[in-house]
Amino acid sequence: MSKSAQRTFPVSWEELHRNAKALAWRLLDIGPFTGIVAVTRGGLVPAAIVARELEMRLVDTFCVATYDDRSIGAPTILKGIEGDGTGLLIIDDLVDTGVTARLVRSHLPKAHFATIYAKPAGRPLVDTFITEVSQDTWILFPWDVELQFAQPIARRRD
Protein backbone atom coordinates (compact mmCIF):
# COMPACT_ATOMS: atom_id res chain seq x y z
CA MET A 1 0.00 0.00 0.00
CA SER A 2 1.10 3.56 -0.51
CA LYS A 3 3.83 4.61 1.86
CA SER A 4 2.47 8.16 2.00
CA ALA A 5 -1.13 7.23 2.86
CA GLN A 6 -2.67 9.95 5.02
CA ARG A 7 -6.34 8.96 5.19
CA THR A 8 -7.91 5.72 6.32
CA PHE A 9 -10.86 3.94 4.77
CA PRO A 10 -12.18 1.18 7.04
CA VAL A 11 -13.94 -1.69 5.27
CA SER A 12 -16.25 -4.02 7.21
CA TRP A 13 -16.74 -7.70 6.44
CA GLU A 14 -20.26 -6.88 5.20
CA GLU A 15 -19.01 -4.13 2.89
CA LEU A 16 -16.26 -6.35 1.52
CA HIS A 17 -18.76 -9.14 0.87
CA ARG A 18 -21.17 -6.74 -0.86
CA ASN A 19 -18.37 -5.32 -3.05
CA ALA A 20 -17.04 -8.78 -3.95
CA LYS A 21 -20.55 -9.77 -5.06
CA ALA A 22 -20.77 -6.56 -7.10
CA LEU A 23 -17.47 -7.54 -8.71
CA ALA A 24 -18.92 -10.96 -9.55
CA TRP A 25 -21.91 -9.27 -11.22
CA ARG A 26 -19.55 -7.20 -13.39
CA LEU A 27 -17.52 -10.27 -14.32
CA LEU A 28 -20.50 -12.49 -15.13
CA ASP A 29 -20.83 -11.33 -18.75
CA ILE A 30 -17.08 -10.97 -19.34
CA GLY A 31 -16.27 -14.68 -18.95
CA PRO A 32 -16.42 -17.55 -19.18
CA PHE A 33 -13.21 -18.09 -17.25
CA THR A 34 -11.44 -21.42 -16.86
CA GLY A 35 -10.22 -20.62 -13.35
CA ILE A 36 -9.55 -17.99 -10.73
CA VAL A 37 -6.13 -16.93 -9.51
CA ALA A 38 -6.13 -15.17 -6.14
CA VAL A 39 -3.21 -12.83 -5.53
CA THR A 40 -2.17 -13.60 -1.97
CA ARG A 41 -2.93 -12.71 0.59
CA GLY A 42 -5.38 -9.89 -0.04
CA GLY A 43 -7.09 -11.56 -2.97
CA LEU A 44 -7.98 -14.76 -1.09
CA VAL A 45 -11.25 -13.64 0.50
CA PRO A 46 -12.58 -11.73 -2.54
CA ALA A 47 -11.60 -14.66 -4.79
CA ALA A 48 -13.54 -17.11 -2.61
CA ILE A 49 -16.66 -14.94 -2.83
CA VAL A 50 -16.33 -14.41 -6.59
CA ALA A 51 -15.69 -18.14 -7.11
CA ARG A 52 -18.88 -18.96 -5.23
CA GLU A 53 -20.97 -16.39 -7.12
CA LEU A 54 -19.65 -17.44 -10.54
CA GLU A 55 -19.86 -21.14 -9.59
CA MET A 56 -16.19 -21.67 -10.33
CA ARG A 57 -14.38 -24.58 -8.68
CA LEU A 58 -10.84 -24.14 -10.01
CA VAL A 59 -9.06 -21.65 -7.75
CA ASP A 60 -5.29 -21.21 -7.51
CA THR A 61 -2.94 -18.65 -6.00
CA PHE A 62 -0.20 -16.35 -7.23
CA CYS A 63 1.81 -15.59 -4.12
CA VAL A 64 3.69 -12.28 -3.99
CA ALA A 65 5.34 -10.49 -1.06
CA THR A 66 5.75 -6.73 -1.55
CA TYR A 67 5.14 -5.07 1.80
CA ASP A 68 4.42 -5.56 5.45
CA ASP A 69 2.65 -3.27 7.88
CA ARG A 70 5.59 -0.86 7.93
CA SER A 71 7.33 -0.74 4.58
CA ILE A 72 7.17 -1.44 0.87
CA GLY A 73 9.91 -3.49 -0.76
CA ALA A 74 10.73 -5.09 -4.08
CA PRO A 75 8.15 -7.72 -5.02
CA THR A 76 9.11 -11.34 -4.54
CA ILE A 77 7.24 -14.20 -6.21
CA LEU A 78 6.73 -16.94 -3.66
CA LYS A 79 4.56 -19.08 -5.98
CA GLY A 80 3.67 -18.38 -9.59
CA ILE A 81 1.31 -19.87 -12.18
CA GLU A 82 2.30 -21.64 -15.40
CA GLY A 83 1.10 -20.37 -18.77
CA ASP A 84 0.16 -16.96 -20.13
CA GLY A 85 -3.12 -16.56 -18.26
CA THR A 86 -5.47 -17.40 -21.13
CA GLY A 87 -8.95 -17.92 -19.68
CA LEU A 88 -7.90 -17.03 -16.15
CA LEU A 89 -9.46 -14.46 -13.85
CA ILE A 90 -7.00 -12.80 -11.47
CA ILE A 91 -8.54 -11.43 -8.27
CA ASP A 92 -6.91 -9.10 -5.76
CA ASP A 93 -8.35 -6.89 -3.06
CA LEU A 94 -6.64 -3.72 -4.24
CA VAL A 95 -4.41 -2.24 -6.89
CA ASP A 96 -2.36 0.54 -5.31
CA THR A 97 0.90 1.67 -6.91
CA GLY A 98 0.69 -1.17 -9.41
CA VAL A 99 3.88 -2.94 -8.29
CA THR A 100 2.15 -6.27 -7.60
CA ALA A 101 -0.27 -5.97 -10.53
CA ARG A 102 2.57 -5.21 -12.95
CA LEU A 103 4.49 -8.28 -11.77
CA VAL A 104 1.47 -10.60 -11.98
CA ARG A 105 0.49 -9.18 -15.40
CA SER A 106 4.01 -9.75 -16.72
CA HIS A 107 3.61 -13.47 -15.92
CA LEU A 108 -0.06 -13.82 -16.95
CA PRO A 109 -0.53 -11.19 -19.67
CA LYS A 110 -3.67 -12.77 -21.18
CA ALA A 111 -5.59 -13.07 -17.91
CA HIS A 112 -8.43 -10.75 -16.91
CA PHE A 113 -7.37 -8.76 -13.82
CA ALA A 114 -10.07 -7.66 -11.35
CA THR A 115 -9.89 -5.92 -7.98
CA ILE A 116 -12.41 -4.55 -5.54
CA TYR A 117 -10.53 -1.30 -4.92
CA ALA A 118 -8.30 0.70 -7.27
CA LYS A 119 -6.07 3.70 -6.68
CA PRO A 120 -5.19 6.06 -9.57
CA ALA A 121 -1.56 4.90 -9.96
CA GLY A 122 -2.55 1.26 -10.41
CA ARG A 123 -5.96 1.59 -12.03
CA PRO A 124 -4.68 1.29 -15.64
CA LEU A 125 -3.30 -2.16 -14.81
CA VAL A 126 -6.66 -3.76 -13.96
CA ASP A 127 -9.48 -4.61 -16.33
CA THR A 128 -12.34 -4.47 -13.82
CA PHE A 129 -12.74 -2.88 -10.38
CA ILE A 130 -15.57 -1.71 -8.13
CA THR A 131 -14.45 1.33 -6.12
CA GLU A 132 -11.76 3.92 -6.75
CA VAL A 133 -10.05 5.49 -3.74
CA SER A 134 -7.50 8.30 -3.62
CA GLN A 135 -3.81 7.46 -3.73
CA ASP A 136 -3.26 8.86 -0.22
CA THR A 137 -5.84 6.56 1.39
CA TRP A 138 -4.89 3.51 3.47
CA ILE A 139 -7.62 0.89 3.22
CA LEU A 140 -8.21 -0.93 6.50
CA PHE A 141 -9.39 -4.39 5.45
CA PRO A 142 -11.38 -6.38 8.01
CA TRP A 143 -8.67 -9.05 8.30
CA ASP A 144 -6.13 -6.37 9.31
CA VAL A 145 -8.06 -4.78 12.17
CA GLU A 146 -9.81 -5.81 15.35
CA LEU A 147 -12.38 -4.11 17.54
CA GLN A 148 -11.21 -2.57 20.77
CA PHE A 149 -12.50 -0.16 23.38
CA ALA A 150 -12.39 3.52 22.42
CA GLN A 151 -12.19 6.21 25.08
CA PRO A 152 -15.14 8.64 25.15
CA ILE A 153 -14.34 11.86 23.28
CA ALA A 154 -14.46 13.92 26.48
CA ARG A 155 -11.65 11.81 27.97
CA ARG A 156 -9.44 12.18 24.90
CA ARG A 157 -9.01 15.94 25.32
CA ASP A 158 -6.27 15.50 27.92
Predicted region positions:
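PRPP-associated nucleotide enzymes
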Residues: 1-158
